Curated annotation (Swiss-Prot):
Protein name (database record): Anti-adapter protein IraM
Function statement: Involved in the stabilization of the sigma stress factor RpoS.
Gene Ontology CC: cytoplasm
Database matches in InterPro entries: Anti-adapter_IraM, PmrD_sf
Lineage of the species this protein comes from: Bacteria, Pseudomonadati, Pseudomonadota, Gammaproteobacteria, Enterobacterales
Subcellular location: Cytoplasm
Amino acid sequence: MNWRVVDSVVSTDTNSVFTLISSQQSFKLILWYKATFYLSSGDTLSINGASITVNNHPVELTLYRTTVYNARFWQTIVNSNTHCAGNHRQSVGRCGYRRKCKLLYCPFQKH
């Protein structure tokens, strides 16, 4: 099945990412996965059994949970992760939260 990434929110406290995806039929899911990969808005995601491709490239995601989209739950996720500037689409030159952040790789800074 093919999906489009609507939005992603990094959880700096848990080294994970929450991503909202939508199917061509407008069915929406929330993915919770380990932050070894970051899905950006507009990415295309294809799931076929155990294989996952992003923008036609195979990737390995450690999925913790998948749940049906609920607007209130999604807003709770967004509102609970406000200390990461990248979650607000702000330019991140130097992260002020880095000492407390549990992410091993920041998707918002150049490396």
